[in-house]
Amino acid sequence: FIGMIPGLIGGLISAIK
């Protein structure tokens, strides 16, 4: 779960950009 958080954040940033 902990390692999953950075992936979600990175995905959101990539989606926004």
UniProtKB/Swiss-Prot annotation:
One GO CC annotation: extracellular region
Main location, first listed in the record: secreted
Keywords carried by this UniProt record: Amidation, Antibiotic, Antimicrobial, Fungicide, Immunity, Innate immunity, Secreted
Expressed in which tissues: Expressed by the venom gland.
Compartment(s): Secreted
Top-level taxon in the UniProt lineage: Eukaryota
Family: Belongs to the non-disulfide-bridged peptide (NDBP) superfamily. Short antimicrobial peptide (group 4) family.
Name by which UniProt lists this protein: Antimicrobial peptide ToAP3
Higher taxonomy: Eukaryota, Metazoa, Ecdysozoa, Arthropoda, Chelicerata
